[in-house]
From Swiss-Prot:
Residues 539-548 have a biased composition (Basic and acidic residues). It comes from the Eukaryota. Mycophenolic acid (MPA) is a non-competitive inhibitor that prevents formation of the closed enzyme conformation by binding to the same site as the amobile flap. In contrast, mizoribine monophosphate (MZP) is a competitive inhibitor that induces the closed conformation. MPA is a potent inhibitor of mammalian IMPDHs but a poor inhibitor of the bacterial enzymes. MZP is a more potent inhibitor of bacterial IMPDH. The active site is at 355 (thioimidate intermediate), 461 (proton acceptor). Signal peptide: none annotated. This is Inosine-5'-monophosphate dehydrogenase. Residues 527-548 are annotated as: Disordered. InterPro entries: Aldolase_TIM (IPR013785), CBS_dom (IPR000644), CBS_dom_sf (IPR046342), IMP_DH (IPR005990), IMP_DH/GMP_Rdtase_CS (IPR015875), IMP_DH_GMPRt (IPR001093). Belongs to the IMPDH/GMPR family. Coiled coil: none annotated. K(+) binds at residues 350, 352, 355, 528. It catalyses: IMP + NAD(+) + H2O = XMP + NADH + H(+).
Length: 548
C-alpha cells in the first residue's frame, strides 16, 4: 500500500526526483533515438504562472543591430510582401521583407514608400516648387498616399495677401527643394475641388503657417503640432529655409501602433531581398539609396560560393547595412555564412507550405531539428536566427521560438491577408481565397512579366535560371482570406504572450535560457496524442481563432 505523505511536504518531496517532468530539449531532438522532428511531433510542458500575459515582452533581435518588438517577419515572396505588407508589419512590431521578383527600380520604390510612411522629423520631405501645378500635386498625393506638401523657392517679394506677387516682382531662383525658402503648404483640402488643374500651387497654397525653429526637440515639436491643430509642422532655420517636417498623422500612428519597428529617426524599419547574382549589386545600390536597413540574401541553399562572395562584397561596400543570410539547416552551413559576415540567419529548407524541395530534391531537414541545431550554434556568435517555413498555426510559432529562433518568418499564414499583393478570387467551392505561390514554382520561374523581363527571382533563388528544363521546387495555389493583418498579427502577438505565460517565462531570453538549462521541458507526441490535442468527438464545430 502506498504511504500517504504530509501534503505540506509536497515541494520538498518533489526535490527527490532527479530531473523535471518531461524531456530536456537535447533528449527530445536526439535523432539517433527519435529521428528528426518537426513542430507537430512535440509539446512544451507548462511551468508556473506568476505574472500576467500583458507583462510578457517579445522584444527580439533580427540581426546583430536591429531589435523588433514582435518576433514575426513576412516572407520575401511575390504573393506575400510588397510595400503595403512591409509597412503594416513594421507598424505592428514585426518586419516585412520586400520580394525581389520585380525590376530593381520598382523594388526601390517600394522601399522608399516604407521609409516615407512614418517619420518623426521628415528629413527628406516631398517638396513642391512654385511652378508645380495643382494637377501634379494631385498626382503626388495619389503616388505617396499622403497630402500636405511644402512649397519652397527663393522670392524677392510676397504680397500682403500671402500669395506670390506678380511675375514682374517675383524671381524664382531655385526649384522647390529642401533648404530653400518656405513659401507655403499645399494640403489635400486646397487641391481636392480646385477646378483649374493647370493653376500653380501658389494659387491655392496656405501661407499662414505655424513653424518651429531648427534645433527644436521632437517632444517640443510634437507639442507645438498638438497645440496648433495643424496637419504639418515645418521646421525652418533662422533664414526661413525649410530643414525638415513633422506630420500630425505620424503622431496618431504612434498612438495606434505603440510596438512599431522604428529607427531613432522614427522611420519604419525596412528589409528587402536580393539574389546572389552579381547583377543584384546594382539592385542593392538602388535599395540602399532608397533607405534600406536590412538586406536578405535570398537562396534556397545558402551555403554557396555565390552567397559567401555576395556577403563579403556587401560588408565591404555597405558596412552600415545588416545582412540576413540563408536559407540553411545545418551547423556547417551556418558556420560558413557567419564566417563570411552574416548578421542574421534564415533557417528552413523544404518545410514551407508551397515548397516541394524535400520531395523533389531529397535534400532538406525537418524544421524543428533545423531550428535547434542552427540556433544553438549561431547563439555562440551572437547571431540571431529566423525560423522560416513549416508554420501552420500559432503554436508552431511558439515552438520555433522555444527551439532557439529569435523570430519566425511566415508566408502562407500572411498570404491570405488584405495587405498581401496576391489577387482575390472566389474558389469553386464559393470561398473567398487569395493566390499564393512558392518562389520555386513553375508559375514564378516562368513569369517574365513580374520581373520586368530581367532576372527572375524564383529561378535565381533555386539556381535554375540557365536550365533548359525547369525543375519545380514549389507549387502555386491559394489560401483562404484572413482579413487584415491589423487584426491577425495582434492575435499572434497576444497568443505568444499567453503561451509564454503558460510556460512560465516573461520574455524570449528567459525562454531560451530555460530551454538550454533544462527548466523548460518538452514531451514527444504520438500520432494518437496529436489527434487528442486537436478538436475531436464533436458532431460539428466552428473554429474561430480570435475576436477583437
Amino acid at each position: 500500500m502506498v504511504e500517504i505523505l504530509d501534503y505540506t511536504k509536497a515541494l520538498e518531496v518533489l526535490k527527490e526526483y532527479p530531473s523535471g517532468d518531461g524531456l530536456h530539449v537535447d533528449t527530445l531532438l536526439d535523432s539517433d533515438n527519435h529521428g528528426a522532428l518537426t513542430y507537430n511531433d512535440f509539446l512544451i510542458l507548462p511551468g508556473s504562472i506568476t505574472f500576467s500575459a500583458a507583462d510578457v515582452s517579445l522584444d527580439t533581435k533580427v540581426t546583430r543591430r536591429f531589435t523588433i518588438k514582435a518576433p514575426l517577419l513576412s516572407s520575401p515572396m511575390d504573393t506575400v510582401t510588397e510595400h503595403n505588407m512591409a509597412i503594416h508589419m513594421a507598424l505592428l512590431g514585426g518586419l516585412g521583407v520586400i520580394h525581389n521578383n520585380c525590376p530593381p527600380d520598382d523594388q526601390a520604390e517600394m522601399v522608399r514608400k516604407v521609409k516615407r510612411y512614418e517619420n518623426g522629423f521628415i528629413l527628406d520631405p516631398v517638396v513642391l516648387s512654385p511652378s508645380t501645378t495643382v494637377a501634379e500635386a494631385k498626382e503626388l498625393k495619389t503616388k505617396w498616399n499622403f497630402g500636405g506638401f511644402p512649397v519652397t523657392g527663393k522670392t524677392h517679394y510676397l504680397s500682403s495677401f500671402g500669395k506670390l506677387a506678380s511675375s514682374d516682382s517675383f524671381s524664382l531662383l531655385e526649384k522647390g527643394t529642401l533648404h530653400s525658402k518656405l513659401l507655403g503648404i499645399v494640403t489635400s483640402r486646397d487641391i481636392q475641388f480646385h477646378k483649374t488643374p493647370e493653376d500653380p500651387v501658389t494659387a491655392v497654397m496656405s501661407t499662414e503657417l505655424v513653424t518651429a525653429p531648427a534645433g527644436t526637440t521632437l517632444a517640443e515639436a510634437n507639442e507645438v503640432l498638438r497645440s496648433s491643430k495643424k496637419g504639418k509642422l515645418p521646421i525652418v532655420d533662422k533664414d526661413g529655409l525649410l530643414v525638415s517636417l513633422l506630420s500630425r498623422s505620424d503622431l496618431m500612428k504612434n498612438i495606434h501602433y505603440p510596438l512599431a519597428s522604428k529607427l531613432p529617426s522614427k522611420q519604419l524599419l525596412c528589409a528587402a531581398a536580393i539574389s546572389t547574382h552579381d547583377a543584384d549589386k546594382v539592385r542593392l545600390q538602388k535599395l540602399v539609396d532608397a533607405g534600406l536597413d536590412i538586406v536578405v540574401v535570398d537562396s534556397s541553399q545558402g551555403n554557396s560560393m555565390y552567397q559567401i562572395a555576395m556577403i563579403k562584397w556587401i560588408k565591404s561596400t555597405f558596412p552600415d547595412i545588416d545582412i540576413i543570410a540563408g536559407n540553411i539547416v545545418t551547423r556547417e552551413q551556418a558556420a560558413a555564412l557567419i564566417a563570411a559576415g552574416a548578421d542574421g540567419l534564415r533557417i528552413g529548407m523544404g518545410s514551407g507550405s508551397a515548397c516541394i524541395t524535400q520531395e523533389v530534391m531529397a535534400v532538406g531537414r525537418p524544421q524543428a531539428a533545423s531550428v535547434r541545431s542552427v540556433s544553438a550554434f549561431a547563439a555562440r556568435f551572437g547571431v540571431p536566427t529566423i525560423a522560416d517555413g513549416g508554420v501552420q498555426n500559432l503554436g508552431h510559432i511558439v515552438k520555433g521560438l522555444a527551439l532557439g529562433a529569435s523570430a519566425v518568418m511566415m508566408g502562407s499564414l500572411l498570404a491570405g491577408t488584405t495587405e498581401s499583393p496576391g489577387e482575390y478570387y472566389v474558389s469553386n467551392e464559393g470561398q473567398l481565397v487569395k493566390a499564393f505561390r512558392g518562389m520555386g514554382s513553375i508559375a514564378v520561374m516562368e513569369d517574365k512579366g513580374k520581373s520586368g523581363g530581367g532576372k527572375n527571382a524564383g529561378a535565381s533563388r533555386y539556381f535554375s535560371e540557365n536550365d533548359k528544363v525547369k525543375v519545380a521546387q514549389g507549387v502555386a495555389g491559394s489560401v483562404v482570406d484572413r482579413g487584415s493583418i491589423t487584426q491577425y498579427v495582434p492575435y499572434l502577438v497576444a497568443g505568444i504572450q499567453h503561451s509564454l505565460q503558460d510556460i512560465g517565462v516573461q520574455d524570449l531570453e528567459a525562454l531560451h535560457n530555460g530551454v538550454n538549462n533544462g527548466q523548460v521541458r518538452f514531451e514527444m507526441r504520438s500520432a494518437s496524442a496529436q489527434t487528442e490535442g486537436n478538436v475531436h468527438g464533436l458532431h460539428s464545430h466552428e473554429k474561430k481563432l480570435y475576436s477583437s
